[in-house]
Amino acid sequence: MSAVRVVLVEDNDTFRETLELLFGVREEIEVVASVATGDEAATVCSSLVPDVVLMDYRMPGLNGAEATRAVLTACPTTRVVCLSASVTQQEIDEVRAAGAVACVTKDEDFDSLVATVREAAAA
């Protein structure tokens, strides 16, 4: 089975770099790009066409719902998983309406996060 190709979208540099390191030791996940904004996500995804975008909800510029729409316009086959420290039900509803297939919190254990990414790719 080939690795799930993932783009990370997270404005917190430390958290984004930590995710890169953690995913880097997992053979089933390949981080193909890592960016800090939703605007960058849409641009990167249009050229890389990842399987999954793991995207923060609260970022400068486009929020998670707006960035999800932009990514899915550029790459309709890509699956988006929203990742946030805390999201309201309204934000979850917004990102789901925009096309995200899942929404998880940043305190989720890493194995569960990997499972969510794999499930999203298989959807």
What are these model-derived regions, one by one?
Residues 34, 53, 80, 103-104:
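Two-component signal transduction core modules
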Residues 65-76:
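Short amphipathic alpha-helix used as the core "switch/output" element in two-component signaling
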Residues 13-33:
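Two-component/phosphorelay signaling modules centered on CheY-like receiver
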Residues 10:
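Conserved acidic carboxylate
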Residues 37-40, 60-66:
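Acidic catalytic/metal-coordinating carboxylates
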Residues 87-104, 108, 115:
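Alpha4 helix (beta4-alpha4-beta5 surface) of REC/receiver domains from two-component response regulators
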Residues 56, 84:
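Active-site residues of response regulator receiver
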Residues 48-54:
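Active-site beta3 strand of CheY-like receiver
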